């Protein structure tokens, strides 16, 4: 359980702001290293730094709420939060529902297997006849279902622990973004390996409700994102947490 002092810090970021500052309610899972995670009772990561930096520029405060990833979209739709900072990939279905900021992470979908199996499963084409895990509510399930051989893949959805079940051999592979996959392999003791190159480019951004209030907030934060991109702040946050700059398209 989070310590009370730390919990208070999570719920209201202490910034010296004018009395007219708005509170931006930000939803995240708190379990997607290195973007949003809890360590020593403190919520931290790429997304936390990003939202704090945006709020500092716009003169707002940030109120973080953690919940299961699969519940984030519903929380945004119902008005319980104002946006989601959890590597939300822009997809046609999501664009039909929400207004998105400009992308701030460019990445790719990655197959990950138990260490030693990367010679047998060499990428997405090797997933025929395999059981593959994805996080419930993520866009990676849809990417797999759009493959021409999707009916040959047993797709299994998880709230969490896809890495552990892959390492234990309960599933043959999992699919996640390449950046997070590489960080999990680097930081955790689990015997995992990347299997082949990314098989789909993804662009991640902040979603907002497509109403007057949501659009106004999107435009305000988008302007701050442009400033952070221009002055190197986005790059610095990326290099701090990932060791490389993923805030611009590859190439």
Regions found by a protein language model. Give the residues of each.
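Bacterial N-terminal signal peptides
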Residues: 6-18
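Periplasmic-binding protein-like
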Residues: 29-30, 106-113, 186-222, 244-251
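A conserved helix-loop-strand patch within extracytoplasmic ligand-binding domains
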Residues: 60, 89, 102-154
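A ligand-binding cleft/hinge motif common to bilobed small-molecule-binding domains
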Residues: 71-74, 86-96, 143-147, 168, ...
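Ligand-binding clefts/hinges and TM-proximal coupling segments of bilobed small-molecule sensing domains
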Residues: 61, 139-155, 189, 194-195, ...
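Extended ligand-binding regions for polar small-molecule ligands
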Residues: 48-57, 116-118, 125, 130-131, ...
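Extracytoplasmic small-molecule ligand-binding "clamshell" domains
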Residues: 22-88, 96, 155, 220, ...
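Short helix-initiation/N-cap motifs at beta->coil->alpha
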Residues: 64-74, 119, 154-168, 179, ...
């Amino acid at each position: 359980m989070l310590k009370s002092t730390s919990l208070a810090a999570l719920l209201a970021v202490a910034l010296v702001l004018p009395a007219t500052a708005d509170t931006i309610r930000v939803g995240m899972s708190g379990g997607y290293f290195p973007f949003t995670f809890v360590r020593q009772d403190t919520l931290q990561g790429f997304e936390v730094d990003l939202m704090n930096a945006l709020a500092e520029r716009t003169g707002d405060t940030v109120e973080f709420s953690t919940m299961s990833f699969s519940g984030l979209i519903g929380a945004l739709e119902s008005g319980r939060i104002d946006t989601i900072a959890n590597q939300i990939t822009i997809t046609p279905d999501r664009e039909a529902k929400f207004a998105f900021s400009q992308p701030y992470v460019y990445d790719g979908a990655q197959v990950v297997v138990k260490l030693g199996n990367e010679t047998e499963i060499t990428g997405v084409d090797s997933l025929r006849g395999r059981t593959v895990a994805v996080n419930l509510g993520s866009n990676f399930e849809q990417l797999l279902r759009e493959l021409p051989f999707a009916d040959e893949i047993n797709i299994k959805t998880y709230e969490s622990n896809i890495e552990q079940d892959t390492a234990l051999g309960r599933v043959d592979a999992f699919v996640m973004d390449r950046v997070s996959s590489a960080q999990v392999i680097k930081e955790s003791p689990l015997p995992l390996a990347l299997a082949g190159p990314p098989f789909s480019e993804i662009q991640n951004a902040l979603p907002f409700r497509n109403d007057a209030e949501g659009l106004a907030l999107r435009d305000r934060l988008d302007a701050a994102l442009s400033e952070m991109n221009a002055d190197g702040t986005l790059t610095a946050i990326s290099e701090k947490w990932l060791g490389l700059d993923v805030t611009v398209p590859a190439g």
